[in-house]
Amino acid sequence: KDPLGPLDVPADALYGVQTMRARQNFPISGLKPLWPFVQAQVWIKKAAALTHKETGRLDAKAADAIVAAADEVLARRHDAHFVVDPYQAGAGTSHNMNVNEVLANRANELLGGSRGTYAPVHPNDHVNMAQSTNDTIPTNIRLSALAQLGPLVAAFEGLRDALAAKGREFDHIVKAGRTHLQDAMPIRLGQEFAAYAGSMDRALRRVREAADYLRDLGIGGSAVGTGVTVEQEYPQLMNRHLREITGLELRVGEDRIQLMQSMGDAAAFSATLRGLAIYLSKSASDLRPVVMGPRR
């Protein structure tokens, strides 16, 4: 039951009425949120519980139960309960509430209670304490992108190094250069591969540079960035706990209003990934006519 009235929720669901309404209101794609997105939101909730326990704002038993519930989610034990369609209205409110409700219900079970009672742990009053969709979702976007950065960079560094190695291996082979699909002036095959490696390196540098802006977090801005209902030390404590939980290098953002209202940093990071993809497509297009024969 919520202010709009009663609504049936599956008895075995860890989510609650807010999530159920979102399922009814936004049956758009039939997809579920990606795991990195869910993971990052749970990281934020875990860090918030630890922060509020540290400041004394949240009862230690409730905080410990929220942390334990978060750890279960992070161990992928409750994936089936994150059900809000990725395409939903607003700034991610339904996704935020899906996580709040799952953690609250599971925390209450761990404390000996039952699902749906929201006592002693409430999804809004405790799991979402001093938070808003408007600061958690922008922070989530930054964390989830940064969490995927390491594997991506490692993979492309391996490709770059392989291209550079082929550049050295093929440096004695002279071939006709190609412009407009016609023979041009001579060039060494090794030079071409060295150029592929150089382009990859430049693209990776742009990715890293754009990613660095994502390390500035606006968490603690609350609803509009001004930090209403938020303790003064909250942003710094959240940053410390998030660094410990995620293993990521993070910074307390200087202007939380700007970090909440603008997705420019995420758009710039996305553009560098798009540039990397374009480079790969271009390189493959270069190589295809060279390797297709005829063999001599």
Where are these regions (language model features)?
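Conserved, well-structured ligand/cofactor-binding cores
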Residues: 1-296
